[in-house]
């Protein structure tokens, strides 16, 4: 599989680097002078050996899982990667000198069945390579050879040569029927990927400030990425890098001492922390004595004075409760690890960078350039007053995550405005040997801003930032109005109505974000997101409830699917049955694409495609047949099984996207 090949290349490079370091250590032991300290070399070599062990283990597991035997695809097989394996073997057999040529497999988007379902597009490239060796061979002839050397695969019904040298692949209905039957027996299985230890840094609100619409995208995107990676069996660490440290806490502590002098004995009744923050900021800006006291409280906080620590904890706890309320409403799970966690590690990283000679004094501060060219914007590691900065905190954090947490992959879900900052951090981490590109992956998952319907930054009518709690409340109100306009309040029980209301409200807010390319700004509109047509959560959720109702309305028991599958095969004779089955089988390819590129709108587009193709199927293929009196006279068990497979796939996708489907809406 292509991912496996990339990891094998990394492994070879890593082994060479480890061997090189071992040789340098041996040289140092023999007494020869080196520019790098022996102890540092040994530490670095130990880290590389650990990475090497983990990578070898993952590759061994993946190689065993892949097996190389295309005659026995697994439930977890991705169709594209399986076809890559088939044609990789064909290229190695027909053209051994080009066995390392990357295989090009593309889905066929034509509505005409004569072009097949997938296409191998390697013949033209191989023809060019042969020509460079003095061998003239037409791409169509090469395609014919590739076809002849393809090993038998139960996924492939037939292969045909088309055009100038394309190999069209037609999928097997028997395989599709078996794959969907297994899906119903065993649940939706994840595709096989090389397992990694991944840390996702997302949400990250600031203490003493309410979560607003600006936090919405990081929170929603981060949660869905975690769910996706967890489903793919990665070891995922969810981190909320709270803004819980800094000079602003000096004024908050000083204000707390004045407003609630007995705070050490009685928990202060701060009902509105935002107002409390504004009051302290006003005093800080207008009262010089208060400002001096605020600065002294910053110092006492940094020194760990018990009273200041207690005040800081009280303020943080008020914010935590507010954040947790939002997280529970949106079904977000994240572990708090704020800036305060890295205070001691900042001292350590500064000493580390100094020891490597990477810090320079510039106008009293200590800076670090991201690379040896000394261009761009340097990081400020130590301020002229001896204090630390966000740059220091982020360098300490990435070092902790790679060296102590032993992460293979770090994902920062932060807005596009921080792009330059994170690029600089990543380069600096690589320059200082904290980050090794051979064994680590770091990504800045950036996103655009949320706009109002006027195309400007989303604000309240008074020009204030929209509070996230107010936004969720408005969503609940709008979704209830829509349900009532459909008369659902008269059909559903109170609990069913509440479940449907929450499903629509929070689902629409999440989906309207995730269905857009995250890099783009997007317009927030309740009217558009609550439409029941087009690529909206409402359309998807309503389609899902309709699918669930089919088996329920059949008058038969479809709860024990494994037992039913013993007597019933999924038949795919009708063109709409076959189209739906092939659409469902794209799931693994889509999930792999989402995880590689970290874009979730691909999964949203897939869900929309499943729902539209299902609607075509349902309109053309009767699942339940009734007479003129409305009595059921026939139930097509195969088609209801296909409906249940569709529901299972949508359910898994909805979970990743954070949608909560209900069986009645």
UniProtKB/Swiss-Prot annotation:
The keyword Nucleotidyltransferase does not apply. InterPro entries: aa-tRNA-synth_I_CS (IPR001412), Arg-tRNA-ligase (IPR001278), Arg-tRNA-synth_N (IPR005148), Arg-tRNA-synth_N_sf (IPR036695), ArgRS_core (IPR035684), DALR_anticod-bd (IPR008909), Rossmann-like_a/b/a_fold (IPR014729), tRNAsynth_Ia_anticodon-bd (IPR009080). A motif ('HIGH' region) lies at residues 205-216. L-arginine binds at residues 204-206, 215, 390, 394, 418. It comes from the Eukaryota. Its EC number is 6.1.1.19. NCBIfam families: argS. This is Probable arginine--tRNA ligase, cytoplasmic. It comes from Drosophila melanogaster (Fruit fly). The lineage of its organism: Eukaryota, Metazoa, Ecdysozoa, Arthropoda, Hexapoda.
């Amino acid at each position: 599989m292509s991912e496996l090949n990339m990891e094998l290349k990394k492994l070879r490079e890593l082994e060479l680097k480890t061997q090189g370091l071992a040789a340098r250590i041996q040289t140092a032991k023999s007494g020869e002078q080196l520019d790098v300290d022996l102890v540092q070399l040994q530490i670095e070599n130990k880290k590389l050996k650990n990475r090497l062990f983990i990578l070898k283990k993952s590759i061994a597991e993946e190689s065993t899982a892949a097996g190389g035997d295309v005659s026995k695809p697994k439930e977890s097989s991705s169709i594209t990667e399986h076809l890559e394996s088939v044609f990789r073997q064909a290229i190695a057999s027909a053209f051994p000198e080009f066995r390392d040529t990357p295989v090009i497999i593309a889905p066929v988007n034509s509505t005409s069945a004569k072009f097949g379902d997938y296409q191998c597009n390697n013949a033209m490239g191989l023809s060019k390579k042969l020509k460079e060796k003095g061998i003239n061979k037409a791409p169509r002839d090469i395609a014919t050879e590739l076809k002849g050397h393809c090993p038998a695969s139960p996924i492939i019904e037939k292969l045909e040569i088309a055009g100038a040298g394309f190999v069209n692949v037609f999928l097997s209905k028997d395989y599709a029927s078996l794959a969907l039957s297994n899906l119903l027996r065993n649940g939706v299985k994840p595709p096989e990927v090389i397992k990694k230890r991944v840390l996702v840094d997302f949400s990250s609100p600031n203490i003493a400030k309410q979560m607003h619409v600006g936090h919405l995208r990081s929170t929603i995107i981060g949660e869905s990425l975690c769910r996706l990676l967890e489903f793919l069996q990665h070891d995922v660490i969810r981190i909320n890098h709270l803004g819980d440290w800094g000079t602003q806490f000096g004024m908050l502590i000083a204000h707390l001492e004045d407003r609630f002098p007995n705070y050490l004995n009685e928990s202060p009744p701060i009902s509105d922390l935002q107002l409390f923050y504004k009051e302290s900021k006003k005093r800080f800006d207008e009262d010089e004595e208060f400002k001096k006291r605020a600065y002294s409280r910053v110092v006492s906080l940094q020194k760990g004075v018990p009273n200041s620590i207690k005040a800081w904890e009280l303020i943080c706890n008020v914010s935590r409760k507010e954040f947790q309320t939002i997280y529970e409403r949106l079904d977000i799970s994240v572990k708090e690890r704020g800036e305060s966690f890295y205070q001691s590690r900042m001292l350590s990283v500064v000493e580390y960078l100094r020891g490597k000679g990477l810090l320079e004094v510039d106008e009293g501060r200590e800076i670090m350039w991201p690379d040896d060219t000394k261009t761009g914007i340097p990081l400020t590691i130590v301020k002229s007053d001896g204090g630390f900065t966000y740059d220091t905190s982020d360098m300490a954090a990435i070092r902790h995550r790679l060296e102590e947490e032993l992460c293979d992959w770090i994902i920062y879900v932060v807005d596009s405005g921080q792009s330059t900052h994170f690029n600089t951090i990543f380069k600096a981490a690589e320059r200082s040997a904290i980050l090794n590109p051979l064994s680590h992956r770091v990504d800045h998952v950036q996103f655009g801003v949320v706009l109002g319907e006027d195309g400007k930054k989303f604000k309240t009518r008074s020009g204030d930032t929209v509070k996230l709690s107010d936004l969720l409340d408005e969503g609940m109100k709008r979704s209830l109005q829509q349900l009532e306009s459909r008369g659902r309040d008269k059909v559903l029980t109170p609990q069913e109505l509440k479940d449907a209301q929450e499903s629509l409200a929070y689902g629409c807010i999440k989906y309207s974000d995730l269905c857009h390319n995250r890099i783009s700004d997007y317009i927030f509109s309740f009217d558009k997101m609550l439409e029941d047509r087009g690529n909206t959560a409402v359309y998807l959720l309503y389609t899902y409830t309709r699918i669930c109702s089919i088996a329920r309305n059949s008058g038969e028991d479809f709860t024990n699917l494994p037992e039913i599958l013993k007597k019933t095969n999924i038949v795919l004779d009708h063109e709409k049955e076959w189209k739906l089955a092939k659409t469902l089988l794209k799931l693994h390819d889509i999930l792999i694409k989402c995880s590689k590129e970290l874009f979730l709108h691909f999964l949203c587009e897939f869900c929309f495609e499943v729902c539209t193709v299902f609607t075509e199927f349902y309109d053309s293929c009767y699942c339940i047949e009734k007479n003129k009196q409305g009595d059921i006279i026939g139930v097509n068990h195969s088609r209801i099984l296909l409906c249940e497979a569709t529901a299972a796939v949508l359910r898994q996708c909805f979970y990743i996207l954070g949608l909560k489907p209900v069986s009645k809406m």
